[in-house]
């Protein structure tokens, strides 16, 4: 999910990327407020539960807050906003950022693309930070499996509003 590294097919779009692979047209663009409404109304159930448990807010407000507090992008699948993700500052001096991703059931429908794109795009999220952290609902099994697959380290269980969450981090990889 590194928009700056994707090859454009067609016209040039500053800050936008488009690619086609035997299926839907997928574009990664800077996140906008209207994307929050579109994704929020259709957010997958596990993400709706997680944003309520972590911040006591609904899906649209969770996306708006996350977008305001980070550099955020939206994944458009066939022109429709389906996934929003970003990285914000947690501790600038220590080089720690907060990474997040929320989406619709399009993640499940396009799981092969999603796994490949997130694995390929992960290094591009480390532009300002050496470490990326966040917490995930312990009951969100799919997200825990995905984070483990990406190489996240699970640090500890924490309590957030009476619900168990798992603190995770990912470190910038260095080529030796």
Regions from the PLM with identified roles:
Residues 24-41, 50:
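A short beta-loop-alpha structural element at the N-terminal edge
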């Amino acid at each position: 999910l590194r928009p700056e590294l994707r090859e454009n097919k067609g016209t040039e779009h500053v800050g936008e990327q488009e690619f086609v692979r035997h299926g839907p047209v997928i574009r990664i663009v800077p996140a906008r407020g209207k994307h929050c409404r579109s994704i929020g109304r259709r957010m997958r159930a596990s993400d709706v539960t997680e944003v309520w448990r972590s911040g006591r807010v609904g899906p649209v407000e969770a996306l708006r807050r996350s977008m305001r507090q980070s550099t955020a992008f939206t994944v458009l699948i066939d022109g429709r906003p389906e996934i929003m993700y970003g990285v914000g500052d947690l501790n600038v001096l220590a080089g720690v950022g907060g990474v997040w991703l929320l989406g619709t059931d399009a993640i499940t429908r396009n799981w092969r693309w999603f796994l490949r794109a997130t694995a390929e795009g992960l290094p591009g999220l480390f532009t300002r930070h050496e470490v990326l952290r966040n917490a995930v609902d312990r009951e969100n099994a799919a997200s825990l499996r995905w984070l483990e697959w990406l190489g996240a380290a699970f640090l500890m269980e924490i309590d957030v509003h009476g619900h168990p969450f798992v603190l995770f981090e990912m470190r910038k990889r260095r080529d030796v």
